[in-house]
């Protein structure tokens, strides 16, 4: 079971009814089921903030010391490493519950990127959601090898939902 809490702090998000708990649960489940280790976990929790430039700017400055708006910020609750996902369940202990973390999305940045890159807004959001969930479970893109692994997973998951590669 995946519990999703969504906070919409910006009215423009309400125009995108298809971005809802059901979609976020479906995407999250698709990502997690790719890793056998997560199949033993009974309950996952994820918090989503749908906000605007002012708030994402504040969060980015506060947590990353970067004074710039960004499309999405991921705040993992666990110190997971993607390589551990392929090993035994020891990295999770005996837990049957995991709070994956928090993700904050900025409407204006995502909207502008969608327009500039000629992408459907919802599809771009889904890509960013997948990308963020991968960050929450320990994936990163600090070097080319990590970036390739992460991008290939994103492309595979997007393809499952009928969305073409953003790369």
From Swiss-Prot:
Gene3D superfamilies: Metalloproteases ('zincins'), catalytic domain. Its main location: cytoplasm. Zn(2+) binds at residues 131, 135, 141. GO terms for molecular function: metalloendopeptidase activity; RNA endonuclease activity; zinc ion binding. Keywords: Cytoplasm, Endonuclease, Hydrolase, Metal-binding, Nuclease, Ribosome biogenesis, rRNA processing, Zinc. The keyword Cell cycle does not apply. Binds 1 zinc ion. One of its GO terms (biological process) is rRNA processing. One of its GO terms (cellular component) is cytoplasm. Its EC number is 3.1.-.-. It is an enzyme of class 3 (hydrolase). Its cofactor is Zn(2+). It comes from the Bacteria. It is found in: Cytoplasm. InterPro entries: MetalPrtase_cat_dom_sf_prd (IPR023091), YbeY (IPR002036), YbeY_CS (IPR020549). The keyword Metal-binding applies. Single strand-specific metallo-endoribonuclease involved in late-stage 70S ribosome quality control and in maturation of the 3' terminus of the 16S rRNA. Belongs to the endoribonuclease YbeY family. This is Endoribonuclease YbeY. It comes from Rickettsia felis (strain ATCC VR-1525 / URRWXCal2). The gene is ybeY.
């Amino acid at each position: 079971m995946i519990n999703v809490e969504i906070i919409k702090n910006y009215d423009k998000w309400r125009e995108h009814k298809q971005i809802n708990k059901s979609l976020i649960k479906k995407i999250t489940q698709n990502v997690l089921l790719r890793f056998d280790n997560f199949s033993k976990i009974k309950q996952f929790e994820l918090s989503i903030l749908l906000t605007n430039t002012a708030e994402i700017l504040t969060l980015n400055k506060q947590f990353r010391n970067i004074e710039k708006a960004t499309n999405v910020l991921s705040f993992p609750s666990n110190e997971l490493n993607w390589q551990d996902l392929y090993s035994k369940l020891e990295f999770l202990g005996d837990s049957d519950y995991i709070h994956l973390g928090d993700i904050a999305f900025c409407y204006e940045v995502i909207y502008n990127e969608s327009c500039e890159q000629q992408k459907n807004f919802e599809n771009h959001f889904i890509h960013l959601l997948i990308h963020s969930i991968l960050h929450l479970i320990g994936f990163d893109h600090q070097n080319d090898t990590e970036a390739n692994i992460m991008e290939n997973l994103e492309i595979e998951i997007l393809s499952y939902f009928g969305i073409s590669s953003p790369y």
